[in-house]
Amino acid sequence: MQFDMYHSYTVDEHTLKAIGILHGIETGALRRAAPIATEVMPEIESRRALYVAMLLHDIAKGRSGNHSVLGAEVALVVCPRLGLSHEETETVSWLILHHLLMSKIAFRYDLNDPQTIEDFASIVQSPERLKLLLVLTVADIRAVGPNIWNGWKATLMRDLYCSCDAV
């Protein structure tokens, strides 16, 4: 269970809501609430990897240790069993490992500092990963609970995405 001031749902409920939100982004149903994520979704080549990453992103929650690191390791074992290619498996593992990174940078760091953007870009490494991480992060945050996503968070996420995309 992850009931606290921030989370309104159990991990499994959160995961299913996040997958539904991801679908809403893909179909355009959330265009007003998540315009940048909706805009970049058609450009994403690794949609299957994105959905699997969303399914598995909190798989290690509740275990002792860093759930992102542990979940990335689980993905390396599970993804091939699901029929994903080596490249898709690596993408899923990378997304799970870094699924908290974009929100952490956007909400806690100075986005006007070029070093912040350069450091983030060096981890992301490609436009495809940037798009994947943006969409995953938006869906993950929106699935935490009602009224968690707001204009301030949307603006910071957009600013980080656009700044990194320009690098």
Name what the model sees in each region.
Residues 1, 16, 20, 45-47:
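Alpha-helical bundle cores of large, well-folded domains in eukaryotic cytoskeletal
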Residues 1-7:
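Non-catalytic interface/linker regions that flank or bridge core catalytic/transmembrane domains
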Residues 7-29:
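Amphipathic alpha-helical
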Residues 10-11, 37-166:
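Divalent metal-dependent catalytic cores for phosphoryl transfer on phosphate-bearing substrates
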Residues 26, 30, 104-107:
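Short amphipathic alpha-helical interaction/hinge segments
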